[in-house]
Every structure is written in C-alpha cells, then in structure tokens.
Amino acid sequence: MSALKQIKFDEKGLIPAISQDFKTGEILMFAWMNQESLKLTIKKQQAVYYSRSRQKIWFKGEESGHIQHIKEIFTDCDNDVILLKIEQIGGISCHTGRISCFFQQLDKKNWKIITNMIKNPRDIYG
C-alpha cells in the first residue's frame, strides 16, 4: 500500500494513533498502531490498533461492541502520528465506560474526574 511508505513507525514498528470524534472534535483516545493494524484500519474503515500489553492486533470494539468507524485519516507533518476522525458506535470509547479516555483534569495539584461513566465496565466486559 503506497500510502504507508511515508509513515514513520518507531524502532518497535509502532506509531501513536489518536481518535477524535469527527462531529464534535473531542479527543476520545490514544492507542498504538503497527503497519498491519494501520493497513486493516484503511481497508476495513474501522479502527484497528496494536496492543503492546497483549502483543497483538486489537479491533476496537471486538469485545465491547464500541466500534470506531473511520471517517478520515490524517498524519502529522512528520508522518509519525496518526489521527483518526471517527464515528464512535455506542458513545463509549474508553474501557472505563466513558466517552473519552481523557476524563481526568489537573486541578492545581490533583487530578479531578470531570466526565461521568456512561456504563459500568463490568456491564460491558462481564
């Protein structure tokens, strides 16, 4: 795939990927991709990531049903970060049951939770 030739994966063969709600612009999550997951994302028009902890390809929503449909894909000026503009199915992108993984805000010296849980993770994952 010629589009992948300009992408700069790191020494581990990975590239950071940010997902953003295509309608609101809200940043939903950060994950890693490898060449295979990026190819699958482009081919299937569905977010596919690489799990460093599990050392395997991870289809977003494969367990939870919270799939990310791709609307647009961007790379940054250095071609070393991917931005996915997505439609989040089910309204939950974070494994904590929230719309976004970025739900903690620094309030002077402490982290404050600013977003409510939409669904308890036990109800999502069992």
From Swiss-Prot:
EC number: 3.5.4.19
GO CC terms of this entry: cytoplasm
The keyword Protease belongs to this UniProt entry's keyword annotation: no
GO molecular function, one term: phosphoribosyl-AMP cyclohydrolase activity
Gene3D superfamilies recorded: Phosphoribosyl-AMP cyclohydrolase (3.10.20.810)
Functional pathway: Amino-acid biosynthesis; L-histidine biosynthesis; L-histidine from 5-phospho-alpha-D-ribose 1-diphosphate: step 3/9
Positions with a binding annotation for Zn(2+): 77, 94, 101
Protein keywords: Amino-acid biosynthesis, Cytoplasm, Histidine biosynthesis, Hydrolase, Magnesium, Metal-binding, Zinc
NCBIfam families named in the record: PRK00051.1
Record's function text: Catalyzes the hydrolysis of the adenine ring of phosphoribosyl-AMP.
Protein name, UniProt field: Phosphoribosyl-AMP cyclohydrolase
Organism listed in the record: Vesicomyosocius okutanii subsp. Calyptogena okutanii (strain HA)
